Amino acid sequence: MTIKILNTFILILAKLLIGLNFSFANDIKLPPIVVGEKNAPIVIKEYFSLTCSHCASFHKNTYPKVKKELIDAGKVKFEFIDYPLDRLAMFAASIARSIPSESYVETTSLLLSNQKKWAYSKDPVTELLKLSKLFGITEKKFNEILNNKELMEKILKKMEEENSRFNISSTPTFVINDKHVISGALKYNEFVKKLKDFELLN
């Protein structure tokens, strides 16, 4: 997806969302979702979409080792940034952002690992509801979230801000120390090689 197409997509997605019958929420906050040592020398931001198969692949095959070898070792601080690339992904991101932030990583991990069951089903919203119930979300709350204009607007605003800074053109994209940008579901060895190429790891 090119940058121009992505910018157009963001505008179209915003119009689609605004066209829904929304009920407004009050004083919604989107706290950063970060794992790892506060003062870790390497800060990695991941931009991901919950309906993106490449994102699901990264979180299944690469992230566990990144967590074990880099994050838990104090070398990396890792931030998760919602970057939904379609309406269904926006719904899923809104679900993840509507539970306590300390459960966000567990929730998105479950959504990504079960992506084929809900995102590519004949009735994805119903399947998303089934998964949401595992997080303690009732059907009533689920419907409220899917009609929460303010929450979705804040997610969109964050997307626009990050895209203007780093020209995010696909998911997953990783920004390292606000300087280096890499894209794709890299294998762990490829991921580490990039960090070494940037002279961030020995």
Model-found features: residue ranges?
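Bacterial N-terminal signal peptides that target proteins for export
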Residues: 1-10
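Bacterial N-terminal signal peptides
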Residues: 10-21
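Short secondary-structure boundary/capping segments
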Residues: 34-36, 68, 165
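Short pre-active-site segment immediately N-terminal to redox-active cysteine/selenocysteine motifs
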Residues: 43, 48-54, 170
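Soluble periplasmic/extracytoplasmic beta-strand elements of cell-envelope proteins
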Residues: 43-46, 77-80, 173-175
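Structural alpha/beta surface segment adjacent to cysteine/selenocysteine redox centers
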Residues: 48-50, 56-134, 138
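C-terminal cap of thioredoxin/glutaredoxin-like
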Residues: 49, 130-202
